[in-house]
Amino acid sequence: MTTVAADLLPPNAGVLNAGLLGGDERRQRLAMFGLSVPALVLVALVLLVPFSWLAWLSFFDASGALSGENYARLLRPAYVNSFLSTLQVSAAVTAICILLGYPVAYLLSQLPQRVAQVLLVFIILPFWTSVLVRTYAWLVLLQREGVINTWLKQLGLISESLPLVNNLTGTIIGMVHVMLPFLILPLYSSMRAIDPVYLRAAANCGASPAQSFRQVFLPLSAPGLGAGAALTFVLCLGFYLTPALLGGGRVAMWSTQIADAVSKFANWGAASALSVALLVVTGIILWAMKWAVRRLGSSLGEG
Amino acid sequence: MSLKRLAIANLLGAATALLMASSAMAAGETLTISGFGGNLQKDLRATLWQPAADAAGVTLSEETQDGLASVRVQVQSGSPTWDIVHLGADECAVGGKEGLFEPLDYKVIKTDGFDKKAYGDHWIATNTYSVVLAWRTDVYKDKHPTSWKDFWDVKAFPGRRALSTYPQEMMEIALLGAGVSKDKLYPLDTKLSLEKLKEIKPDISVWWSSGAQSAQLLKDKEVDMMAIWGSRVASVIKDGAPVEFTYDNGILGYGCLAILKGSTHVAAAQKFIAGVVSPEIQARIPEMMPYYGPTNSLAFKVGKFSPEVLAKSNMSPENVAKQTFIDANWWRDNNELVREDYSLLISN
């Protein structure tokens, strides 16, 4: 606020009361910092302290001696494969969410606000239902004697039940369902913020609807898409419940390995190392995505 | 007015007396026992723990444990709030090796009637469960599978199968499927076992990870035959699903009790455990917890059971002869290595 005010004043006015303005700014900064202290303390207590403890644990083996054993273990094929399949599943779910979610968010953003708000309820509705319930519902729908297979058989479209669940297919269907709102909501709000004037201007300049979408709308919605995709991808990386229930034990997600290390093998050191690895990789991916989205946004804007 | 005051004074006096009486009873000693929770813990308390606590003159307080890790945290704290823990036998064996438990006093606890594999220096099995072969009778109408060899015979018995994500019992089952005789299982030939599992893997539709899930798979006909806990398949049959199972070639596993190191009630805990494994209290299992079994075979000498109860109990002399006991000590020493190979095999 003060800087804006300073900009509005004549150039020499700033010099006259610079000391006063500076003091004002410092006081305001202090006040802002003071206001955020409770939040900082909370984050430190519930996030940083436990995580530091977790990271600390990961350097000790089961007998309590200092060792890199827990990290060396991560290079074994079982863990490497699990890590790769976690990335694959997360990427697939994110891609499907984008394909399904982008048109929906686009449609919502083009509708009158009141209609869009009603339709948004349908997207938010699943949020109010427990993930466990939704996952079991998929089990009922997708299993061999489930609703979908029974219908398809009665319609004579298939003679043998399709393997829709207890495998990768079922896992991805279930995860997409849970993740879709996380993609659509940030995307929708960023699309709403795009001023329709830009698109009209593009049309006035002779751009076809496809051109104005590609050259104007898409780059402007890229930050929202990036945020939604990053959120979806990162949530997928740590997803436990749905893969565990719909994967039939055949989709080895990283989170399953962490749960196993704690619950089946009581090895907190190993579980900690797995968690630290997941966190580091998540951080790297988030950073890379942020960078990529910025590049994408600017290159599309130029092209 | 004074009459009313008198009445109140009387009431207070009676209440105080009552309070004192109940605190005097509790003063005996309170043992805190931590188990798996849920129905199993409820049944165990009613069947085994409460009568044993009454006999030992202690009050019982219950908690739930979350695997050996939670026990480790309790012991490492120096003053555990649990005295006794109910775990799976391999967890007891691992905990014993790690020094988490007090040694059991076998002068107090009598092991007559116990299989040698069913107790160790620091733990004793208190109830058994069976992992059995179960199948859908609507799928296998004329000829049903009768052994793990049939489970591996996908030509004679086509159909979708399920095994557990836990290597325990499954490694044994694979060896039985390979034709290894049940008295020659241990030490497990892990190489052969994993080979057999790899061979059957394309026909395993689901690797289940919880008892509830395993029951649902069979009930909803998601799979046609599977390895499943006896107690779970029993509930599926009770629900009217066309399912049968056999104790033939079943694997017997244990739940066990151990005393946490640092407990301040060790002597009372020893007495309590002695009660739990006594033939008289063990004899309550066949009727109160069908499909589970007593670990003390003398229970069948002490108790009189109807043929129906005996047919259901996994430990009745007739049924126990068909099955084989898990070796908790082998799993204690090999768990982690086998587990990694096993999960590698499942997920690749």
Please name every model-derived segment:
Chain B
Residues 27-94:
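Early extracytoplasmic/lumenal segment of secretory-pathway proteins
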Residues 36-45, 80-82, 86-219:
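Extracytoplasmic ligand-binding site segments that recognize negatively charged/polar headgroups
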Residues 90-96, 219, 224-242:
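A ligand-binding cleft/hinge motif common to bilobed small-molecule-binding domains
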Residues 95-103, 115-121, 235-247, 308-311:
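Ligand-binding "clamshell"
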Residues 129-131, 191-200, 237-263, 304-308:
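Periplasmic-binding protein-like
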Residues 132-139, 175-180, 254-266, 273, ...:
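A bilobed periplasmic-binding-protein/Venus flytrap-type ligand-binding module shared by bacterial periplasmic
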Residues 260-320:
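Mature extracytoplasmic/periplasmic domains
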Residues 318-348:
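Conserved C-terminal helix/tail region of periplasmic/extracytoplasmic solute-binding proteins
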